[in-house]
């Protein structure tokens, strides 16, 4: 991802950036469908359960091939496109049997490159194969948790995991969060890192661009009224009035672990993620 600055012609473009490699192309009709983004942070009763969400431009969902079911059939990258539903780019693949599918864009892949998925395929960027066929130290993304379900881990822009050990029926992975966990060696993954690495360095430049993405303003609890937040109230710039910060619903915030204590994957996690 190449970040370039706008010319400072207006206040909104003074701090804005643009991705020069972003390609505008119409998505394929048989690979998209409309979706009704109901709720937008509300539950079934209309109460806000996830803040700072709402509005935004209409989106068409692109069907991404997370399973990589085209085994031992070579495909060619035709386009690298923007996807409004994720911060990673996607690329359109034309396979030798006539199939056309979207996959996550691997970092460094360009138009014209060939990819393939299978059991005995080269360790090359963009190729998908089981963990048992990969050497130790391989950088991977789009990792399956359940065999045949499709990739679920390391799918965000710039995400990459590392295969650090294989023993018995399990493989040990170090995930982007720093967590070390076990996964079946028969599960598949894609070689390489997800593209669009510099997305976190992109500056939208103005509030309107943020609203187009469906993200609403973030308001501090200390400037609210007591009815709206436990930190609210007081005369002028008052402190929060309690020993530890809290969420809008009164639960401890900022540092309290929220993971469930009894989960099926507790025995598979060798080391918890790091902050």
UniProtKB/Swiss-Prot annotation:
SMART domains: Ribosomal_L2, Ribosomal_L2_C. GO terms for biological process: mitochondrial translation. InterPro entries: NA-bd_OB-fold, Rib_uL2_dom2, Ribosomal_uL2, Ribosomal_uL2_bac/org-type, Ribosomal_uL2_C, Ribosomal_uL2_CS, Ribosomal_uL2_dom3, Ribosomal_uL2_RNA-bd_dom. Residues 7-26 have a biased composition (Polar residues). Its main location: plastid. The keyword Nuclease does not apply. Residues 1-26, 224-275 are annotated as: Disordered. It is found in: Plastid, Chloroplast. Keywords: Chloroplast, Plastid, Ribonucleoprotein, Ribosomal protein. Pfam families: Ribosomal_L2, Ribosomal_L2_C. GO terms for cellular component: chloroplast; mitochondrial large ribosomal subunit. GO terms for molecular function: rRNA binding; structural constituent of ribosome; transferase activity. Belongs to the universal ribosomal protein uL2 family. HAMAP family: Ribosomal_uL2_B. Part of the 50S ribosomal subunit. This is Large ribosomal subunit protein uL2cz/uL2cy. The gene is rpl2-A.
